[in-house]
């Protein structure tokens, strides 16, 4: 399965300028996804992060991986248009600056699904070199109570 930006907008709730993925080239619902974010010179965050040395903020790199990963769930039956919240992020690493003109390839896989908790591994690549990676958990809001601990 493939999705262009218009199709992505139909199945998930993020919108420009916060929609941080452009298209998915390969989706296996409930399993994995590959897709891209094209970093244009006029992206809103390049103006402020950092003047003279523009690069994609790390948390927006994470958000791109989350948005791409969510397509694995949103392409499942009866999941179109739902919302997923980030509840955990681990093993977060940044290896390379992502700059204007880069083509960020995002590869994600669903590693486990326990009720409404979805655990993912994801990596962003620039020219076949890993730029960022993380494991994280997304949850359907209201589906279960997350106890913050004591």
Where do the PLM segments sit?
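Hydrophobic beta-strand-centered segment that forms part of the acyl-chain substrate-binding groove
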Residues: 1-2, 69-107, 131-141
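Catalytic strand-loop segment that frames the active site of acyl-thioester-processing enzymes
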Residues: 15-56
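A structural signal for short, hydrophobic beta-strand segments that form beta-sheets
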Residues: 21-25, 86-87, 110
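Hydrophobic/aromatic beta-strand elements that line small-molecule binding cavities or substrate pockets
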Residues: 22-23, 90-92, 121-122
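Active-site helix/loop of acyl-thioester processing domains in fatty-acid/polyketide metabolism
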Residues: 24, 56-80
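HotDog/MaoC-like acyl-thioester-processing domains
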Residues: 30, 98-105, 109-150
């Amino acid at each position: 399965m493939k999705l262009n930006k218009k199709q992505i907008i139909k199945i998930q709730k993020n919108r420009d300028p916060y929609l941080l993925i452009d298209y998915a080239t390969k989706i296996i619902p409930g399993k994995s996804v590959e897709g891209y974010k094209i970093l244009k010179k006029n992206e809103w965050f390049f103006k402020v992060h950092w003047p003279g040395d523009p690069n994609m903020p790390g948390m927006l790199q994470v958000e791109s991986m989350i948005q791409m990963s969510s397509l694995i769930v949103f392409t499942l039956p009866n999941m179109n248009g739902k919302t997923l919240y980030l509840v955990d992020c681990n093993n977060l690493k940044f290896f390379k600056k992502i700059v204007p003109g880069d083509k960020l390839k995002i590869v994600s896989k669903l590693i486990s699904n326990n009720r409404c908790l979805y655990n993912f591994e994801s990596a962003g690549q620039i020219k076949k070199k890993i730029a960022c990676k993380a494991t994280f958990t997304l949850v359907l809001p209201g589906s279960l109570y997350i106890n913050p601990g004591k």
